[in-house]
Every structure is written in C-alpha cells, then in structure tokens.
C-alpha cells in the first residue's frame, strides 16, 4: 500500500503520549518515525521574568518585602533553603508549570500563584517557592499594558480600570 507521511510539532513533555498513540494505532506494522528537537532561538522571549536584587535579602526579609509591595493577604511558601535571595524569577498567574525553568535558571526565589500542595516539594533545597496569589501576582500588569498602549496608539483613548476584581478574600 501507499505510505503516508505525517509531520507534527509538539512540546517535549508530550513525546511519550504521542509515541504511545502512534504505536497503538500501528499495532501490526513497524512504524518508521523520526524526532527532531527544536531549540528555542530566542531564549529571552517567553513567559515571566528573571532579575537580580541590588541588595540580597534573607528569605524571610524577601517574603515580607514581597508581601508589602505586592499587597498580599498572605504568602504560601516552601521551606527556607538557608540561602540569601539575589536572583528572582517571577511569573504572574498560574505558574506551576515553570518551577523547573526557575530552578534551571539558577533563581534563588520564584514568585508565582495557584500552586498545589505537592508542587512545593519540587523546590525542596533548590529555591524559595512562593505563591503570592493569582490576583496579586498580576495586579500591576495592567499599568504596564496601559502605558505601552498609550505610547503605541496615540489616537486611541486607553482608560485604566480601577475596579478590584479579586474574588479571593483574606481573614
């Protein structure tokens, strides 16, 4: 019969699932396949940011500073590593998928939101992992978006909402 060639681009973490599906659908034939890994040519483009503090802080000082500046009702965090905080990774919103990226980048701390219980173990002795709250982690983003739009679209009125839409309350 005729051979069919199918090409697919997928994220690395899906490789096993895709191969299982491929083998399952070709159970009676030997499957010819090749995998080419694509390397990101633009390492500075993506979600989140990483930077360094001018003055390193203890982990407790850093969390208290973050709580004040981000106006958090509370911060859930991993065990202290005993290291000073200098290099910080930040990803607004639900950022659990990037814990490994923050570790690989050599961050001392990773600020994000919506972490689940077991995800705090991923940081163990590697970095300080802090869940500062979804709304809190994104609260200032709108200011930067408005500033950017006002510079780029001069003939358009950009109005910043003052509405606080955080459904999460703290006691």
Where are these regions (language model features)?
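Hydrophobic structural segments
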Residues: 1-171
């Amino acid at each position: 019969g005729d051979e069919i060639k199918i090409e697919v681009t997928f994220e690395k973490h899906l490789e096993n699932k895709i191969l299982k599906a491929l083998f399952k659908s070709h159970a009676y034939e030997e499957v010819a396949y090749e995998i080419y890994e694509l390397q990101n040519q633009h390492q500075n483009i993506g979600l989140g940011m990483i930077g360094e503090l001018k003055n390193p802080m203890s982990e407790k000082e850093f969390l208290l500073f973050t709580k004040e500046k981000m106006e958090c009702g509370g911060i859930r965090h991993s065990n202290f590593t005993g290291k000073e905080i200098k290099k910080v990774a930040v990803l607004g919103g639900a950022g659990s998928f990037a814990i490994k990226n923050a570790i690989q980048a050599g961050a001392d701390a990773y600020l994000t939101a919506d972490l689940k219980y077991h995800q705090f173990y991923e940081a163990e002795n590697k970095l300080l992992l802090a869940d500062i709250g979804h709304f809190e982690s994104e609260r200032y983003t709108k200011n930067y978006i408005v500033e950017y739009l006002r510079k780029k679209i001069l003939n358009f009125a950009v109005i910043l909402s003052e509405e606080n839409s955080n459904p999460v309350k703290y006691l």
